[in-house]
């Protein structure tokens, strides 16, 4: 079923691989690459807050390097 916000936060805090993020969270609504391609930004639209949450992926390791999840 759906994960709670806390479960999502706990999951992202472990710096999982991008494939694991997509498997767990589903496909992002939008993906952007940083200027030097070192970071990939996955945006997920959240209906409740009418805004996007962001997950940063390090392009060389493919691990989560940061996130903003409200």
Where are these regions (language model features)?
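Residues within mature, well-folded domains
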Residues: 1-70
């Amino acid at each position: 079923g759906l994960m709670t916000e806390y479960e999502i936060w706990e999951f992202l805090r472990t710096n999982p691989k991008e494939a694991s993020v997509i498997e767990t969270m589903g496909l992002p609504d939008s993906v952007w690459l940083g200027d030097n391609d070192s970071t990939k930004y996955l945006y997920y639209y959240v209906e409740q807050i009418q805004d996007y949450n962001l997950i940063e992926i390090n392009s060389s390791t493919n691990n989560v390097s940061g996130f903003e999840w409200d």
